[in-house]
């Protein structure tokens, strides 16, 4: 027979367990809101720096905080501007809300700072009338078998990275209008972004336009996981999930796990 003391101890233990669980959940939420957040990349606009289904670790504190960088609360107009703001560096890979569609998140490379004059001529970036250093270093063949020319680019601050351009097919250059643009004057408080996959990126050259600093969410740091296919498609049931588990495991890109996004040794 259970005594009143036994019941009291059981209830006390249950409350302690729920309290501990709630504490852990609160800490996890605070970490995601203020410190770091994982992102999944659905498109190839940053290929081959970032591939489709790469899982990115990003730091929320790198640029301070705005309404858009606070996970779970970004739909509530809590405040305007940024608090604890830190200026981004040219060449950063940034996760942000595009000003023309606040329902999605983009990830691109920051090229132009406020006050900059930006233009692309024959695929070469000119910043304030000075062309950046750009050297062809080889080719890249995508998982779909598409050939890209690979270039190493160096920005005025010394930061280097790789960009990619579709290789000409029978002498025909793809999407040449992306490589020869109008002049862009970056307004105060806004930034100019490009995708590393220069011929297949919706960036500041076309529909995206300039991105306000307020729209920045986080700075991308490294790839913590990567897979060629998505296992948890919304339109498949439990049986299909089980059947798809083996090919999903086999599709994991082991060579991309924990890859630093700013490493240009490869």
From Swiss-Prot:
General function of this protein = Complements E.coli mutants temperature-sensitive for LepB function.
Main localization category: membrane
Short name of one Pfam family: Peptidase_S26
| Cellular component per GO, a single term | plasma membrane
The transmembrane residues are 21-41
Membrane-side (Periplasmic) residue stretches: 42-266
User: GO molecular function, one example?
Assistant: serine-type endopeptidase activity
**UniProt protein name:** Signal peptidase I
Query: Source organism lineage?
Result: Bacteria, Pseudomonadati, Pseudomonadota, Alphaproteobacteria, Rickettsiales
């Amino acid at each position: 027979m259970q005594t009143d003391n036994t019941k009291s101890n059981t209830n006390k233990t249950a409350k302690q367990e729920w309290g501990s669980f709630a504490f852990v959940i609160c800490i996890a939420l605070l970490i995601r809101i203020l410190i770091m957040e994982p992102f999944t990349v659905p498109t190839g606009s940053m290929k081959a720096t970032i591939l489709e289904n790469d899982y990115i670790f990003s730091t929320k504190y790198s640029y301070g905080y705005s309404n858009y960088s606070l996970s779970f609360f970004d739909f509530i107009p809590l405040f305007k501007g940024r608090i604890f703001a830190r200026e981004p560096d040219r060449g950063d890979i940034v996760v942000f809300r595009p000003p023309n569609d606040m329902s999605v998140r983009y990830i691109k490379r920051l090229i132009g700072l406020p006050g900059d004059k930006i233009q692309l001529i024959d695929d070469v970036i000119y910043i304030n009338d000075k062309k950046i250093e750009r050297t062809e270093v080889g080719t890249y063949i995508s998982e779909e078998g598409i050939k890209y020319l690979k270039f190493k680019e160096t920005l005025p601050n010394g930061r280097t990275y790789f960009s990619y351009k579709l290789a000409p097919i029978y002498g025909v250059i793809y999407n040449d209008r992306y490589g020869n643009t109008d002049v862009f004057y970056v307004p105060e408080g806004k930034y100019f972004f490009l995708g590393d996959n220069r011929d297949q990126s919706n960036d500041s050259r076309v529909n995206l336009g300039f991105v306000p600093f307020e729209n920045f969410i986080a700075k991308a740091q490294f790839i913590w996981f990567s897979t060629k296919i998505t296992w948890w498609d919304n339109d498949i049931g439990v049986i299909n999930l089980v059947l798809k588990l083996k090919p999903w495991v086999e599709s994991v890109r082991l060579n991309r796990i924990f890859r630093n996004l700013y490493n240009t040794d490869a």
